[in-house]
Amino acid sequence: AQGLSLAQLWRRVDGIDQALYQSRTGRPHPHRDKKVLTAWNGIMISALAEAGDTLGEPRYLAAAQRAADLLWAKVRVAPGEVRRLYLDGRALHPGLLEDYAFLGGGLVALYDATGEPHWLGRARELADALWSRFADAAEGPSGGGLFMGEVADTSLMVRPKDVSDGAMPSGTAAALHLLAALARRTDEPAYGERAKALVAAASGQVRHLPAAFPSLLVGLNRLRQGETGPRQYAARGAARIEARILPQDTGAATLIIDLALSPGWHVNAHQPLQDYLIPTAVRLAGDAPGWHIDGIAYPTPEVLKLGFQQEPLAIYQGPARIEAALTPEPDRGDRARVWLPVELGLQACGDVLCLPPETLVLQVPFRAG
């Protein structure tokens, strides 16, 4: 209303907030609950990491990293063992399922936002500990799944399981999300198998009252359909793909896809030298009406002979960038479209084997004028 730019608006809001805070410091502060709960902090770490990544706000990402490092130093009392809370310099009470699961999820979010492998390593440690500490190995209708507390805890007459959502997502749902994420980001098949076992153990309850299990159902979709958003993982975590769209003043746009591969891995070029190889290819998904691709610039491939193949191969094995020119259709009506679905087909190979072909659907944020 006053003709302010977005940056000017935020500066003005920050100034108002600072003035209010300075005024508030002149009055007695209310008492504060100083407990640092591991599960709740794990949720906040996820939120900060995702917000910092999506909004390009380094303050949020830095706060998530500080919180994660503090928890790792204070509530992780031994490898694979975390406490429920931290208070007055002490880590107290054995961690519950939700503590391991939510903190692990926060560490995965930090790995996604930064690409730093130590966050993924920490998340794997918690996921492995979660399964060994809370899994119900009993067979039968009531067996399987995860207990809320330690399997070795005999202080209760029964061992409850946290499956349905309440004010927060259930510990089981958080564990499912963690395992599904690690199944995409690592080459360890056990994570996917454990995630499927969780779904199977809860299937009877979910079928009876699905409305009580929204987080679990979202986790099931994540496990079966893969990730959503502009960042995806393929080749058992060996390939990391990120996409973005740069709008142009003309109404057209440029789609940029960056592909990073772990050492020892490659994907076939867009035009392989052999007809039987699966090419790397980009196209718009079927539910992206109103746009078409005018042209795609694929990177120049390397032509190499590898140990498992006598013939030369045209491949991408380092950081590779694909750029596509997007042009709107004349009668396009969704000018405020928020996401553009883009398909990337590829087949990844290591030193001794090739994995099955994969098709990823990247939901790329996009606002056009």
Question: What function would you assign to each model-found segment?
Answer:
Residues G192-E193, V206-G369:
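Extracellular/lumen-exposed scaffold segments
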Residues A1-A243, D249-D258:
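Glycan-recognition and catalytic cores of secretory/periplasmic carbohydrate-active enzymes
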